[in-house]
Amino acid sequence: FPEDEDVRRIDYHEPNCRYKQIQMYASRGCPRRCNFCAAATLYYDELNWRPRNVASVVEEIRTLHEKYPGMEGVFFDEEVHNIKKSFNISLAKAIRSAGLDHLKYEAMCEYASLDEEALEEMRAAGYYKIRFGIETGSDKVAEKMTLGKKHDLDKLRSMVKFGKSLGMLFYGTISIGGLGSNQEEDQKTVDLVYEMASKGWLDEIQVSINTPQPGTDFYNTCMEESLLSNSTNWEGFDGNGQVVVHYPHYPAEEIQTNFNKALSAFDFGKEEAQTRVFSKNAESSFNLIPDGARVLLLRCVRNWMIRLTLENLNKKASVDLLGQNVSTKDLKDLDGLDQIYSYGSGFFSVESIPLELIEKLRNKQYDFVLIPVANNHLQGYQNVLEVAETILPKEILYVYPEGHLQPAQPVTI
């Protein structure tokens, strides 16, 4: 098993998971050669997929759980967990036989290789979320990206619909601005995101700008076709909001616009799908906030959750919002907001917020600061909590995605 003596793996559990899940690998490699992916050209020297021995995987889970009682589950974070149906069924059955099906399991998969029988076995073993790369809603772009068998939108819809009937959650990744894309083709991706989110099929999303990393086929094509600037700024190659490819037919500004549209499409679709569940729970949970309370809402999650939180406060409270400049622009016209405070850019932290703004917020004497959160273990929200404590409200409450409120730890003064 991986080294776990001087480095405690539980201390590095994946913060982007809903539960406290330790990362594991049940397989190595990938049989696909997507043009933007480094796995085929840098990580491995050939296209293959090699699963581990099932008994070894189960023994690693058992060993970790015995060593770390606080461990809540496993995140199988390999390239692709489900190329071979028989492997997934065998692993799921072995997990159940070992009495480890009370843990929460999440896995990086390929939707085109999902199977109904395997999904049923995985769900019964404790798998609660599947992650996969959708990449694009365009057949034309998929061909240029060399997605091959990985791209099958009919299979995507049928497998996700079936998985939802089992109670499975799905996390999709998409990219904008890939080889072969243009305004029309990327709009198909935006439309697909909204369709899946509004039907309740897509629970979480990661949107990237398709970026040619050195060593990938995409990068080599860009070099051959002079699609990269001569004065390359490598800091822009993170896929997170910066466009480095220069298509003559598809300006960087349009790619950036479609990147933002894809995020907004998820927000609006997710809000549409989640409204009933959130509002049902909020009906009782939000009674923690009395009429006339002074509330500051921190914008530290996607906008769909901010909108639902405001909607379910139902004007019972006076609500202000604190967030980044770029995020607050999309929220300025929302009903139920009295005042929006922008602190600039960067993640929530006490250091990122000007002292004069902190003093102004303290003077408002808020009854509550609300911190919307996307996971149960609250990993990644410590800085946000420190900001809330610095503002000195009477009470701090977490808002969970299903509409529940929970008091945070006492304010440190």
Model-predicted regions and their roles:
Residues P2-F170:
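Radical SAM [4Fe-4S] cluster-binding motif and immediate context
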Residues H65-E66, G70-D77, H102-E106, A125-I134, ...:
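Conserved C-terminal portion of the radical SAM core fold
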Residues E110-Y111, E135, S175, N210, ...:
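Histidine-centered beta-alpha loop that forms part of the nucleotide-sugar donor binding/catalytic region
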Residues L296-L310, K315-T412:
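Active-site and donor-binding regions of nucleotide-sugar-utilizing enzymes
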Residues A40, D77, G133, S208, ...:
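Conserved residues at the C-terminal ends of beta-strands
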Residues G73-F75, K129, R294, D367-L370:
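Structural motif
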Residues N281-R302:
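Nucleotide-activated donor-dependent transferases that construct or modify glycoconjugates
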Residues D4-D11, N16-C17, Q21-Q23, E184-A282:
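C-terminal accessory regions of radical SAM enzymes
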